[in-house]
Amino acid sequence: MICDKCQKQATYSRKYSGETLCSECFSNSILHKVAKTISKYKMIKNNELVCVAVSGGKDSLVLLDILNKMSKTHNFRLLVVTIDEGIPGYRDEALKIVESFCMQLKIQHKIFSYKKLFDLTLEESLELRKDQKLSSCSICGTFRRRALDHAAKSINANVIATGHNLDDVLQTFLINTLSGDTAKIGWMDPDTSSNKLRKIKPLSEIYESEIVFYAFTNNLPFQTEPCPHMDEGIRTELREFLNSLESNHSGIKNNMYSSILKISQIVKKANHKEKLNCSVCGNECTGDVCSVCKMITRLTNE
């Protein structure tokens, strides 16, 4: 195979576009696509501090690598944050990888833990739960979002950047749809430019398979061991389902993403709610009690 861009030996075949690319042109195409996504949705503005959420997995480290390269030619700053859920053995390895990579890039790195923020690790939370329908992903996701908010505010960041890729977005849409939680579909609109603390997903238009290839092509270190609790949710089944569809119908993930953008904008307008303050902790929420306080009560009082 010959690269369509530079005529060198190709290493990647992009089925949904029909392109064949060498490693360098492939990496440049990913950088260009991410930059276009950031520009299109006004994700980062001049002189802003971006709180980059880096777990140690492939997605977040690819995100950090790309944002670091972009920061050399654009006017924004980076600070890396890692959330320690308290999963023995698993998180320890990831923290070492992130710390080492941040030292290499000369970017400041801070760690925030569930234990300090909520007085519960994820493992302790799982031991407390009595309702097995309450998945580890539900507990972890609720705590993680609050932990990232806290981290970003504590460092005076303007933006929180996470490594969610195209596949993650599609899976989340299906999870919200299948669970009947349609309000959350409105949260999926990538245009968050009006929010005080913006949460952005610069990799939201990049296939997971291409993130893997980018990581290997650029020799990025990342944790390969999956979360020990990942099989509790439906996400793995949905990943396999979507990959099967894409295998038989190249580009179907891109088509689905385009539909999700339109649906999320409609739902966002229809479900607009005034922001309130939680009566327990004082954090911003849409009801009387925030999701974190509800979760802690559910775990400790059941």
Show where each model-derived region lies:
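Flexible helical/loop "lid" subdomain adjacent to adenine-nucleotide binding pockets
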Residues: 31, 39, 49, 167-171, ...
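ATP-dependent adenylation/nucleotidyltransferase module used to activate substrates
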Residues: 2-175, 179-186, 205-218, 290
